[in-house]
Amino acid sequence: MSKSEQDFTRFVALPDPRFAVEAEERKLCVSGVEFGARYTLTFRAGLPAESGEGLIKETKIEFYVRDRTPKVSFPGRGYILPSSGEASIPVQTVNSEELDLTLRRVSDRNILRVFQDDLFAKPLYRFQAERLAGDIGEEVWSGTGLTESVLNQDSKTRLPISEAIAGQPAGVYVLSASLKSETYRYGTVAQQWFVLTDIGLSSVAGRDGLQALCKNVEAVSACGTA
C-alpha cells in the first residue's frame, strides 16, 4: 500500500457504516467486525499500491471471522473459604461448556517452593502445572465443572466446590481448571489459590495502637479466647 496515502476509506466499500479501515505496514485492516460472522468487502479501482500502481478493477472478497479461541481463567487472586457449608469459586470462560478440575493441597513446607518457582496466582504452562502436581501439591479431588457459555462472549460461572473440600483439613489449596477439548489441552492451566479455614484474621490501626481481630468465618462471630 502507498505510504503517502493515509485514508483508504474511499477505496473500500464496507458492509457496515460502523466499520473502519486503516493501513498497518503492508496490511489493510478492518475493525469493528464480529467473531463468527461472514462479510464481503469491495475494493474499488484505484486502490494504490506501494509501487504507485492502482487496482485495475473493482474486486470483491468474502471472508469469515473465526470464533474466539476457547479460554478459561480465574478473575480472583485468592479467597478464604470456610471448611464447612456451601462454597463456590468464580471462573471466567470463553466458548467452553465443561472444564477439567483438580484440587490440590499444598503443605506448609512447600509454600515457599511455590513462590521460589513463581507458581503462585498465575496461569501456568503445562510443564509448570506438572511440577506443581508432582512435586509440590497433593491431589485430593478431581472432577468436571459445567459452565455457562454464550458464543464468543466472556461468561462467568460460580463453580460449586463444597463436595471437593468436604472433610479436608484447614490449609492452602489450589484449584486447577483446563479446557475439556483435546484440541486445547496444551494451553495454559488456570489456577485459583485459596485458604480453607474457619478462622479469619484482620487488623485495625488506631491512636491506641494495632488491634488484631479473630473471627469465625462461617458464623461471622468472634473466636472467644483465641
Predicted regions located by residue number:
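N-terminal, cleavable Sec-dependent signal peptides of secreted/periplasmic/extracellular proteins
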Residues: 1-226
